[in-house]
């Protein structure tokens, strides 16, 4: 009888040891990848995991993931298409292009447009500035609905040749009045696309 009990006890102990051994083997943590060896895909997965675990506020989400603000059409004057454009760009990043007159150097453009940016800042407009040529600059807005107000300010400046908003060119105070204006505007539009790509890349690297 005692022998039978002893055998059962040994059997139970053996099964217990076997279970613990198998469990420890299955739950052994995998070797973690050194964060210094992470590539872009690893970082993207890590960011997704963080976003799943955290309740991210709407304002902290990337722009393409945010819900567009509702447009109240009752407040829009149908006779002014610009008003609809303003509402549709509310809360979205938008680029405003401007040209400085008088064939300036890039340094002169930097100084002149820096003064413009300072005036906009003092008027509580949040804009970033990127000089993209000897006489060309981009003003990047976090809220695109203010683009037309900024355009109105820029075209009133003495050294402003023209301003481009959403592909539409507005002549500035120092606009050129010649037959080549249309051709120059088409060239600017092509150059603006390249400049916008460079500015976006610079923004992402900041």
From Swiss-Prot:
Region Structured core, annotated ranges: 93-166
GO terms for cellular component: endoplasmic reticulum
Leader sequence residues: 1-24
Motif Prevents secretion from ER boundaries: 203-206
Chain intervals with Basic and acidic residues compositional bias: 175-195
An individual GO BP term: protein folding
Subcellular location: Endoplasmic reticulum
Region (Disordered) residue spans: 171-206
InterPro entries membership: MESD (IPR019330)
UniProtKB keywords: Chaperone, Endoplasmic reticulum, Signal, Wnt signaling pathway
Family annotation (Pfam families): Mesd
Family: Belongs to the MESD family.
Job description of the protein: Chaperone specifically assisting the folding of beta-propeller/EGF modules within the family of low-density lipoprotein receptors (LDLRs). Acts as a modulator of the Wnt pathway, since some LDLRs are coreceptors for the canonical Wnt pathway.
Assembly notes: Monomer.
Protein name: LRP chaperone MESD
Species annotation: Danio rerio (Zebrafish)
This protein's encoding gene: mesd
